[in-house]
């Protein structure tokens, strides 16, 4: 619970920063239109809720389990329908604010999002068998990063998979996964919570200052 709360609260703060770039922080947007859109922590928060749901289902707590699995998966479609159904600017502003902060939606996230939710669930479901887990991960990579992309953008050529649609390269993660011995390494958990947001905004500030 503490781990989830840390991830979630940081994701809310970073989501609020991103929302401000879209709505009130125009002067801080780089002249070429770029600004940080890093919401990986929001992706993790959504995934953790879904995984908790699978755990509850495994313990036959079906009500809360199915709710925890289905709500994070389906909520973006509900929010999108609510946005489409109304042109009220205050209502739309509120829905956008909630979607960037306290109620993140996987379909709206540029950094991770739906892919993180999908891959996280696949890894969790096959967690009891290392080799089956890795095979499932590789198959999901092929289907999501190659087959899906070809269906969505049929005009892609081979070079595009190295310059535009390069997400398939996460297949190479199979190598360290095979080498992992299953034990937790040394590290400072507090360092991560500071480093992740700080390095993003420091690097952005430098790029903003040096931009020509």
Model feature map: region roles:
Residues 1-212:
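Alpha-helical transmembrane segments and their immediate juxtamembrane cytosolic regions
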């Amino acid at each position: 619970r503490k781990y989830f709360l840390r991830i979630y609260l940081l994701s809310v703060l970073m989501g609020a920063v991103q929302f401000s770039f879209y709505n009130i922080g125009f002067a801080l947007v780089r002249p070429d239109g770029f600004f940080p859109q890093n919401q990986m922590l929001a992706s993790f928060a959504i995934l953790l809720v879904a995984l908790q749901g699978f755990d509850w289902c495994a313990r036959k707590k079906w009500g809360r389990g199915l709710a925890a699995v289905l709500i994070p998966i389906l909520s973006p479609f509900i929010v999108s329908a609510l946005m489409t159904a109304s042109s009220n600017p205050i209502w739309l502003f509120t829905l956008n604010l909630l979607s960037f902060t306290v109620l993140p939606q996987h379909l709206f996230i540029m950094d991770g999002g739906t892919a993180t939710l999908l891959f996280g669930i696949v890894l969790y479901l096959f967690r009891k068998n290392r080799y089956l887990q890795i095979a499932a991960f590789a198959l999901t990579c092929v289907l999501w990063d190659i087959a899906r992309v070809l269906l969505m953008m049929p005009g892609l050529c081979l070079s595009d998979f190295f310059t535009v649609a390069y997400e398939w390269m996460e297949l190479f993660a199979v190598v360290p996964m095979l080498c992992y011995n299953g034990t937790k390494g040394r590290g400072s958990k507090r360092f991560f919570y500071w480093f992740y947001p700080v390095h993003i905004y420091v690097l952005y500030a430098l790029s903003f200052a040096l931009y020509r």
